[in-house]
């Protein structure tokens, strides 16, 4: 297999990926959503994906998660081709999708149950419950939790499988502004603790700048990578600094041209 435009030895490689969907009311017609997407991620890197609404960001995440297959191109984690779902790729959505009849601890265990390794790994449940700051809430049920706490459970459930890549599909999008900023710090703390490779889809430009090593800017559909922006600001980052605000203006300008003033 020959990989183009991507780095060999990467944690995640996406090479010339195309994806289309059938148009229900037009037999034989397909809508091209992704058109030649290529990028790679180094192990331990945190990268954000931004772009106009409908440009295919979530579709791309589904392909990397193995929930759907591309029409063309290659997706690899390490040297292994992505052909379906795997515990090597964790996925966290905007909705935490907790089981309401299970406690926090049991919800986190669900990640191990799905892999059939609960018996061998049960000792890690307490570790990950504490890791996300919920050590005192292991016996609580989802209806006792705030939105931010629920997302912490979802993160722990994904991380307990020790994924090589964690995919985050707007996981903080439903939270209020204050909680969202606190959870950004929480995700960064988990990332610094575990150094898990993370790919974050977000509509929040400030969030992307605050959290990421790099930002990939997509065009409107059919989605392509328009440009890559390296974020060289030291952490912790100051959202009010001149350098932060300059980056924000730069990215918004790129998005304006990439999306022709589409809603971002």
Regions found by a protein language model. Name each.
Residues 1-9, 264:
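Short, low-complexity, intrinsically disordered N-terminal peptides in bacterial proteins
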Residues 7-195, 199-204, 211:
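ABC family nucleotide-binding domain
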Residues 20-23, 235, 257:
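Active-site/binding-pocket entry motifs
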Residues 77, 217-218:
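Short hydrophobic beta-strand elements within the C-terminal catalytic ATPase subdomain
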Residues 83, 93, 219, 230-232:
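Residue-level detector of conserved, well-ordered beta-strand and adjacent loop positions
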Residues 174-177, 246-264:
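Extended, non-globular alpha-helical segments
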Residues 211-217:
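Conserved catalytic segment of ABC-fold P-loop ATPases
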Residues 221-250:
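Conserved beta-strand-loop-alpha-helix hinge in the C-terminal portion
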């Amino acid at each position: 297999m020959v990989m183009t435009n991507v780095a060999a030895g990467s944690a995640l490689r996406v090479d010339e990926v195309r994806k289309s969907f059938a148009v229900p009311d037009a037999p034989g017609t397909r809508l091209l959503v992704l058109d030649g997407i290529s990028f790679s991620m180094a192990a331990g890197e945190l990268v954000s994906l931004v772009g106009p609404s409908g440009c295919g960001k979530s579709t791309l995440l589904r392909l990397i998660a193995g929930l759907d297959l591309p029409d063309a191109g290659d997706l690899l984690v390490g040297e292994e081709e992505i052909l379906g779902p795997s515990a090597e790729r964790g996925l966290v959505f905007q909705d935490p999708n907790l089981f309401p009849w299970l406690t926090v601890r049991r919800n986190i265990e669900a990640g191990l149950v799905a892999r059939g390794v609960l018996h061998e790994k049960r000792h890690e449940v307490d570790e990950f419950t504490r890791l996300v700051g919920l050590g005192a809430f292991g016996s609580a049920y989802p209806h006792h939790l705030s939105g931010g706490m629920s997302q912490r459970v979802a993160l722990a459930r994904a991380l307990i499988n020790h994924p090589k890549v964690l995919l985050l599909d707007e996981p903080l999008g439903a939270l209020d502004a204050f909680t969202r900023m606190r959870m950004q710090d929480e995700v960064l703390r988990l990332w610094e603790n575990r150094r898990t490779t993370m790919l974050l889809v977000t509509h929040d430009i400030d969030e992307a700048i605050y959290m990421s090593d790099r930002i990939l800017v997509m065009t409107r559909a059919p989605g392509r990578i328009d440009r890559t922006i390296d974020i060289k600001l030291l952490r912790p980052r100051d959202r009010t600094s001149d350098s932060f605000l300059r980056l924000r203006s730069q990215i918004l300008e790129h998005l304006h041209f990439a999306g022709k003033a589409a809603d971002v």
